[in-house]
């Protein structure tokens, strides 16, 4: 081990920073966040650095460095572009046995700064010992995606109850077992879900010896339009801790593969007028699985609250007192339009956008047509393929120009994406001619003409 990792309490301690430029500013921000009192020495000091020092109760010395500047300082930072000066500062600090860091010069350092993941009070440090700082930063970036920001709140919860638990369990092994149970169970789940008051109530009940009810939880997760890279960090984390996954037809196989390997997978997909599993049965499955203590991911394509019937499902959960979380996803309109190079709004073409379902609960296409032909408006139709001839006919009948630019986006955001553009009157012909099938999004509006300039993503199937 080249360096021993330690965490230094700098709160209220004087730290000397030699240098007044951008590098000194970056180091000083980190030190100020840790509560250090800054003493910055340089002939010239950037305005932002001066403001930072003033806000932290430190001092700026507009002159060259002198060894006496080390007096009373518990840490020294040399952050200038003068190698000789940096070496001089390092030698002075070593002679006084004061920890010193020289930026980009590991050989002159007695301490080095790691790459930091801050989930205060939880802190994770990654270091390559100065040999590969870029690699350390890349690893930190990966850890940032694995550890949610709410883990800091979880550590804070433990801190508030630490003394109670220590009094209850004098034995170290007992305390460790208690906290392991807390951090891997429903108490942690409540805190990570942002339900701090409920987490505190459950933890106090556990300390008081009350029996824990083993109700599971349901995570209603939006899987986005198809590209796995469009999943949120939160969605991925919950998918990887679920015991059971109930998934729809529109969830891409590549996304399903990101779920926990040993999770039970249950297909509950639906097509128009062909529901593999009726909605009320899906609702009951969610309730039953949660009551059995399972952590259940209900995985839906796009966003669960935009034509996804997510509201119906969590109404049922709420009626049975089942804990749930909702994780929004990128809806098909946003994702598919972006990957097709079609901005849904544009100052010159559309000041509003309207998301419309292509068929209603009873299977009809009875829509408020007079509202849908307003000028400077983009229309996006979900599930509109079957009713497309009626949609085009009614829009034209109610005043939308037959030559209005329009697009069909099949399997948007995936390698199988196909995009067909034409006019509103052309759409039914394009569907028949190119054998377009679901899932396909329909966009109507002047913004479609921008695709010719803005298209950037080309799926394996090409576009017309």
From Swiss-Prot:
Q: Which UniProt keywords apply?
A: Cobalamin biosynthesis, Lyase, Methyltransferase, Multifunctional enzyme, NAD, Oxidoreductase, Phosphoprotein, Porphyrin biosynthesis, S-adenosyl-L-methionine, Transferase
* Xref: Pfam families: CysG_dimeriser (PF10414), NAD_binding_7 (PF13241), Sirohm_synth_M (PF14824), TP_methylase (PF00590)
GO molecular function, one example? Answer: NAD binding
EC code(s) of this entry: 2.1.1.107, 1.3.1.76, 4.99.1.4
Annotated S-adenosyl-L-methionine binding lies at: 225, 301-303, 306, 331-332, 383, 412
Pathway stated in the Swiss-Prot or TrEMBL entry: Cofactor biosynthesis; adenosylcobalamin biosynthesis; precorrin-2 from uroporphyrinogen III: step 1/1; Cofactor biosynthesis; adenosylcobalamin biosynthesis; sirohydrochlorin from precorrin-2: step 1/1; Porphyrin-containing compound metabolism; siroheme biosynthesis; precorrin-2 from uroporphyrinogen III: step 1/1; Porphyrin-containing compound metabolism; siroheme biosynthesis; siroheme from sirohydrochlorin: step 1/1
In this chain, NAD(+) is annotated as bound at 22-23, 43-44
Q: Where is this region: Uroporphyrinogen-III C-methyltransferase?
A: 216-464
Q: Which domain of life is it from?
A: Bacteria
Region (Precorrin-2 dehydrogenase /sirohydrochlorin ferrochelatase) location? 1-203
**What's the family?**
In the N-terminal section; belongs to the precorrin-2 dehydrogenase / sirohydrochlorin ferrochelatase family. In the C-terminal section; belongs to the precorrin methyltransferase family.
HAMAP family membership: Siroheme_synth (MF_01646)
Q: What is this protein called?
A: Siroheme synthase
């Amino acid at each position: 081990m080249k360096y021993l990792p330690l965490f230094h309490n700098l709160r209220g301690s004087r730290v000397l920073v030699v240098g007044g430029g951008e590098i000194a500013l970056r180091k000083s921000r980190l030190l100020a966040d840790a509560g250090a009192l800054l003493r910055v020495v340089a002939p010239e000091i950037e305005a932002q650095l001066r403001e930072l020092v003033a806000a932290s109760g430190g001092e700026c010395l507009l002159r060259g460095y002198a060894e006496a500047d080390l007096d009373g300082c518990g840490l020294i930072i040399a952050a200038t572009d003068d190698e000789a000066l940096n070496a001089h500062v390092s030698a002075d600090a070593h002679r006084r046995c004061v920890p010193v860091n020289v930026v980009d010069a590991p050989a002159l350092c007695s301490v080095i700064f790691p790459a930091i993941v801050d989930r205060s009070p939880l802190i994770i440090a990654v270091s390559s010992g100065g040999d590969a700082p870029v690699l350390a930063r890349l690893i930190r970036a990966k850890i940032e995606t694995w550890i949610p920001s709410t883990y800091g709140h979880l550590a804070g919860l433990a801190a508030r109850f630490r003394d109670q638990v220590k009094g209850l369990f004098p034995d170290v092994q007992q305390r460790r077992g208690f906290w392991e149970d807390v951090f891997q169970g429903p108490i942690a789940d409540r805190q990570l879900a942002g339900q701090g008051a409920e987490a505190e109530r459950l933890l106090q009940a556990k300390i008081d010896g009350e029996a824990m009810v083993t109700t599971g939880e349901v995570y209603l997760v939006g899987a986005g339009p198809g590209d796995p890279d469009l999943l949120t960090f939160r969605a991925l984390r919950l998918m990887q801790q679920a015991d059971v996954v109930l998934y729809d037809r529109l969830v891409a196989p590549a996304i399903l593969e990101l779920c926990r390997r040993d999770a039970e997978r249950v297909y509950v997909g639906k097509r128009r007028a062909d529901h593999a599993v009726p909605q009320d049965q899906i609702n009951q499955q969610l309730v039953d699985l949660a009551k059995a203590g399972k952590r259940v991911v209900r995985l839906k394509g796009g966003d669960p609250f935009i034509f996804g019937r997510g509201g119906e499902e969590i109404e049922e959960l709420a009626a049975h007192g089942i804990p749930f979380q909702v994780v929004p996803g990128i809806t098909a309109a946003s994702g598919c339009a972006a990957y097709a190079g079609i901005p849904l709004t544009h100052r010159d073409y559309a000041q509003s956008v309207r998301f419309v379902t292509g068929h209603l609960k009873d299977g009809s296409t009875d829509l408020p047509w007079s509202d849908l032909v307003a000028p400077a408006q983009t229309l996006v139709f979900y599930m509109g393929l079957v009713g497309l001839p009626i949609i085009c006919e009614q829009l034209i009948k109610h005043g939308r120009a037959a030559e209005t630019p329009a697009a069909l986006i099949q399997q948007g955001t995936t390698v199988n994406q196909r995009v067909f553009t034409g006019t509103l009157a052309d759409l039914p012909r394009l569907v028949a001619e190119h054998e377009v099938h679901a899932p396909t999004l329909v966009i109507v509006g002047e913004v479609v003409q921008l695709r010719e300039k803005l298209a950037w993503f080309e799926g394996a199937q090409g576009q017309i």
